[in-house]
Every structure is written in structure tokens, then in C-alpha cells.
């Protein structure tokens, strides 16, 4: 078993102890096979953020006091002696009237969802609306075949996928408009084979849906478009409410997890550009998987850089191996550790953090809170822009 804990010296002045310094334990996991990090010194913005967290955030005093390795994660076993999934990773069986309705409509229109393609464990909960009543679905456009081959992804791949259906934006918009959804996520495969990486097709889909359902909240979960600013601008200005692009894993594991054409710097730049191009009030969002071999220290550094890029929402979920052909799971992170990352993310200044073993980038519970947040922002904006009543005579 790997050694799980070492200390991250986060200094914190507690209100009830004059001039006392508390060394906080971190989720740092140092593996015997790892070598000392060779990362350059973080930029001043990150240094300032670390200082602010250490000095000003009282909730960090309780951050991750994990005393044994099992508090952070559990092993997955070996090929010869595999271990069963922990109890918190048990999946529920999809069902419900809305679930059945959405699935039937998808088949009729020959549309694809990443929920099905990626075998998402939350599909039934999201499609049915679950406890919140906010039914959501994640529609995948530009076909079901990706030009890239990330080591975690179950979507089929090809260097030359079929051309996109030119009528797809209209079909998707009409289908989604008829489902009675409150919040929809539109995503796509990577289309490196297309001159504009599929960005025009993506933007057209969002625009057509907004015409039919102007009050529906739309999240666009986009590929990196090879970092092309023109492609990012096109989608950012299409009328979406949330611009999402996933960095997938910590900076140090990018080449081990993602396709060689993707990288951390490029993804971070896409998120920065989206913030610049999109209308005021548009949220930016990203997600990473845990259990890929990352250390807690790497997760924290990645969070710092994502927040410094102005990202509003971040989600964390457990990586699950889709098949034996894919990258193996390194470890199962405990719900308690996920909760610590959520607390730290909120202390860093993210507006919302969804973190849990079964959380995925497009997750019903998270979308419910994001919807509430956007509604509140718009109500406040409307109130501040309304003319003040004239004083009584």
C-alpha cells in the first residue's frame, strides 16, 4: 500500500488563539515510485491565493486530517486478485416516466447522448429529475465517433468519422424543446477532421434551441478546438449560459490520460478565452476525474491554476474504467476526501463545486444549483437595471 500522507504547510491564524500557527494536514499522497516535482515556481497570482487561503480561511483548520491511508482511498486490487468496488460506488438502475420518454425520443430521432455512450452511472437520476425535479440530459452532437483516443473514454474513435448531419442542429433543438427539460448540456466528440473543428455546427445548435426555448438554460461542454480562438469565440457568443471544457485530470497526468493533441495549458487557455468572449454573466466550468494516479498535492495545485484562470464552477468525480481496454483505476477515493476537496474549492473562491464519487461533469444535482445561481444573478441584474421609483410628492 502506498504511503498516503505528508504535510502541506498551510499557515492559518485561528480567531481564538493569539499569534498561534496551525499546520494543516493535506491530502498529499506521495507514492514510493514518484520523483520530486520539478514544476516551476507558480505565478504571483497563485502565491497570493495560497497566502490568502492560509491566513483568511477559518474552514481550512479542519481540512483533511486523515490519519490512515484508508481514510483517503481504497485499493482496487490486482489482475489476479481484484477487489470489489466500495459500497459508495454501487450504481442505481435507471427508470421513471421521464427517463422512458427521453430514451424513446432519442431512438426515434437517431440522436446520441454522452450519458449512454460513456455509460454514466447517473443517467436514470438525471433523466428522471431525481430529488430536485430538474430533469437534465447531455446530448452529443457532431456524430458518435471521435477523432481522438483518450485513455479513459468509451466513445468510439476514427481518423475519418462520417460527416456531420447538416440537419442535426434543427433536429436536436426540436427534440430538446419537446422534452420539458429545465437545463440541457450539449456536448460533442472532437472533430479535428473539420476546418472549424465543428464549432459552427455547435453554435448553430445552441442558437436554434434558444429560439425555440429562450428560457431554457444551455450548457455547452466543448472540446478544445485545438486552442483556436476563433472557434472558442464562435461558441462563446452563441447564446449559451454555461461554457464548459474539461481539463480531465491534474496537470502532471495529462499525457497519460488524454490524447496527445490535448494538454493542460491549451485547455486552460480555452477557458480563459471563453470568459473574455462570452456575454457578461456567462459561467465557465471544468471537471477532473480522481483515481487516475494523481496525488492530493497535484489536485490542489491544479485547482489553484483553474481558479486563477477565472473558472466559476469545478466538479470532481471518481474515474471508472469503461472496459479492460481502457486505463485502469488507480484507487477509489473516499466520499470524505471528495468532501474535503469541495470545501477547499469553495474557500478558493469557486462559485460552486460538485465533488463526490458518482459526480460527473454533467450532473443533475450540480445543474440544479447552477440553474438557481444563474436565476439569482439575472434577478439581481434586472433589479439593479430597473429605474428607481420616483419619490412621492
Swiss-Prot record:
Its EC number is 2.8.1.8. GO terms for molecular function: 4 iron, 4 sulfur cluster binding; lipoate synthase activity; metal ion binding. It is found in: Mitochondrion. GO terms for cellular component: mitochondrion. It catalyses: [[Fe-S] cluster scaffold protein carrying a second [4Fe-4S](2+) cluster] + N(6)-octanoyl-L-lysyl-[protein] + 2 oxidized [2Fe-2S]-[ferredoxin] + 2 S-adenosyl-L-methionine + 4 H(+) = [[Fe-S] cluster scaffold protein] + N(6)-[(R)-dihydrolipoyl]-L-lysyl-[protein] + 4 Fe(3+) + 2 hydrogen sulfide + 2 5'-deoxyadenosine + 2 L-methionine + 2 reduced [2Fe-2S]-[ferredoxin]. Binds 2 [4Fe-4S] clusters per subunit. One cluster is coordinated with 3 cysteines and an exchangeable S-adenosyl-L-methionine. Pathway: Protein modification; protein lipoylation via endogenous pathway; protein N(6)-(lipoyl)lysine from octanoyl-[acyl-carrier-protein]: step 2/2. SMART domains: Elp3 (SM00729). [4Fe-4S] cluster 2 binds at residues 146, 150, 153. Keywords: 4Fe-4S, Iron, Iron-sulfur, Metal-binding, Mitochondrion, S-adenosyl-L-methionine, Transferase. The keyword Metal-binding applies. [4Fe-4S] cluster 1 binds at residues 115, 120, 126, 362. Its main location: mitochondrion. The keyword DNA-binding does not apply. Its cofactor is [4Fe-4S] cluster. It is an enzyme of class 2 (transferase). InterPro entries: Aldolase_TIM (IPR013785), Elp3/MiaA/NifB-like_rSAM (IPR006638), LIAS_N (IPR031691), Lipoyl_synth (IPR003698), Lipoyl_synth_mt (IPR027527), rSAM (IPR007197). Residues 131-351 form the Radical SAM core domain. This protein may be expected to contain an N-terminal transit peptide but none has been predicted. Belongs to the radical SAM superfamily. Lipoyl synthase family. This is Lipoyl synthase, mitochondrial. It comes from Vitis vinifera (Grape).
Amino acid at each position: 500500500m502506498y504511503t498516503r500522507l505528508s504535510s502541506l504547510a498551510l499557515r492559518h491564524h485561528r480567531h481564538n488563539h493569539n499569534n498561534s500557527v496551525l499546520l494543516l494536514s493535506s491530502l498529499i499522497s506521495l507514492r514510493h515510485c514518484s520523483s520530486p516535482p520539478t514544476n516551476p515556481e507558480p505565478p504571483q497570482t497563485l502565491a497570493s491565493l495560497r497566502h490568502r487561503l492560509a491566513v483568511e480561511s477559518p474552514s481550512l483548520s479542519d481540512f483533511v486530517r486523515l490519519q490512515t491511508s484508508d481514510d483517503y482511498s481504497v485499493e482496487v486490487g490486482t489482475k489476479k486478485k481484484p477487489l470489489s468496488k466500495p459500497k459508495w460506488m454501487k450504481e442505481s438502475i435507471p427508470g421513471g416516466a421521464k427517463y422512458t420518454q427521453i430514451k424513446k425520443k432519442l431512438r426515434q430521432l437517431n440522436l446520441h447522448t454522452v450519458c449512454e455512450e460513456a455509460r454514466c452511472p447517473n443517467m436514470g437520476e438525471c433523466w428522471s429529475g431525481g430529488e430536485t425535479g430538474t430533469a437534465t440530459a447531455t446530448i452529443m452532437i457532431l456524430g458518435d465517433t471521435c477523432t481522438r483516443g483518450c485513455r479513459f473514454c468509451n466513445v468510439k474513435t476514427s481518423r475519418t468519422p462520417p460527416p456531420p448531419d447538416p440537419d442535426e442542429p434543427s433536429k436536436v433543438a426540436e427534440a430538446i424543446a419537446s422534452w420539458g427539460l429545465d437545463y440541457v448540456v450539449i456536448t460533442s466528440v472532437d472533430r479535428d477532421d473539420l476546418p472549424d473543428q465543428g464549432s459552427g455546427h455547435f453554435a448553430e445548435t445552441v442558437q436554434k434551441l434558444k429560439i425555440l426555448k429562450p428560457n431554457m438554460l444551455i450548457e455547452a461542454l466543448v472540446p478544445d478546438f485545438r486552442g483556436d480562438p476563433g472557434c472558442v469565440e464562435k461558441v462563446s457568443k452563441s447564446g449559451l449560459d454555461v461554457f464548459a471544457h474539461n481539463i480531465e485530470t491534474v496537470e502532471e497526468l495529462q499525457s497519460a490520460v488524454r490524447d496527445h493533441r490535448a494538454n493542460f495549458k491549451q485547455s486552460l487557455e480555452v477557458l480563459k478565452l471563453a470568459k473574455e468572449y462570452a456575454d457578461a454573466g456567462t459561467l465557465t466550468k471544468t471537471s477532473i476525474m480522481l483515481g487516475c494516479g494523481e496525488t492530493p498535492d497535484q489536485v490542489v495545485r491544479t485547482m489553484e491554476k483553474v481558479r486563477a484562470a477565472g473558472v466559476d464552477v469545478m466538479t470532481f468525480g471518481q474515474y471508472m474504467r469503461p472496459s479492460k481496454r481502457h486505463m485502469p483505476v488507480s484507487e477509489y477515493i473516499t466520499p470524505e476526501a471528495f468532501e474535503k476537496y469541495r470545501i477547499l474549492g469553495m474557500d478558493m473562491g469557486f462559485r460552486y463545486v460538485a465533488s463526490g464519487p458518482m459526480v460527473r461533469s454533467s450532473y443533475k444535482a450540480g445543474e440544479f444549483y447552477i440553474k438557481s445561481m444563474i436565476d439569482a444573478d439575472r434577478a439581481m441584474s434586472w433589479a439593479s437595471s430597473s429605474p428607481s421609483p420616483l419619490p412621492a410628492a
